[in-house]
Amino acid sequence: MKGSTVHTKWQAYCRLMRIDKPIGSLLLLWPTLWALWLAGRGIPEAKILVVFVLGVFFMRAAGCVVNDYADRHIDGFVKRTASRPLPSGTISEKESKILFVVLILLSFGLVLTLNSMTIWLSLAALALAWIYPFMKRVTHLPQVVLGAAFGWSIPMGFAAVSESLPLVCWLLLLANICWTVAYDTQYAMVDRDDDLRIGVKSTAILFGQHDKLIIGLLQLATLLLMVAIGWLMNLGGAFYWSILLAGALFTHQQKMIAQREREPCFRAFLNNNYVGLVLFLGILISYW
């Protein structure tokens, strides 16, 4: 294989795993760090932290691969996804399957260094990562499944650090699901016209003209759940300031999606990286 061909193939694999678009990894990373710091009431054990950070990137990459495999016959009809490696033929279906298996094996190898409770919970993480891409064909609520998939590192984090799943763990998971449905609805608003044309379901379609209101309510629920978590964990004032800052970011996002235009809706989605970061900094400073 010529050097230029190898380079082209490598670039295609990177695009398939979204290495060039880290936003998904970051949106998966922040809830993971929330959980690890809350479960350990401060900085978690270095080994656990490394395992989860690497796991975030491996599992996000695996999720992108299976998502593109599930959508390989419809991505060519959507403007934003038509040039992806599978619909464009740069990567074959067999190659994508092999890559998915490799990424899952790497992830599971990491989990095997943790306790048995975390290992068992990881099986649910695999199931959620696999079924999510197919949910948009059977329900208008695939974003709820995505929220569970993106948030499953939360119970895994608590299990790894404390070998327990307290109330705070489940409240944090619920907050993350609300947040994920909100930001992924913003993302789905970008593709709403294409999705309606090809018959793909999403919360953006389900919510219709009430989309902005429901996104706002989900964002409010996220903030209120975070307040409850702060109270239960006796977090300091820095955490509550971070909640206020997150609320300001949500308000800014509402302004961006006001006209339901593609580019501003996508920018609103990207802005959620700062929400996750701000909330993590609030937790971090509280345990300083």
From Swiss-Prot:
What's a GO biological-process term for it? ubiquinone biosynthetic process
Concerning InterPro entries, the annotation shows: HB_polyprenyltransferase-like (IPR006370), Prenyltransferase (IPR039653), UbiA_prenyltransferase (IPR000537), UbiA_prenylTrfase_CS (IPR030470), UbiA_sf (IPR044878)
- Report the subcellular localization: Cell inner membrane
E.C. number(s) listed in UniProt? 2.5.1.39
- Judged by the first EC level, this protein's enzyme class is transferase
Keyword Chloroplast set for record: no
One GO cellular-component annotation of the UniProt record comes to: plasma membrane
* Purpose: Catalyzes the prenylation of para-hydroxybenzoate (PHB) with an all-trans polyprenyl group. Mediates the second step in the final reaction sequence of ubiquinone-8 (UQ-8) biosynthesis, which is the condensation of the polyisoprenoid side chain with PHB, generating the first membrane-bound Q intermediate 3-octaprenyl-4-hydroxybenzoate.
Q: Can you tell me which family this protein belongs to?
A: Belongs to the UbiA prenyltransferase family.
| This protein's name | 4-hydroxybenzoate octaprenyltransferase
Name the gene that codes for it.
ubiA
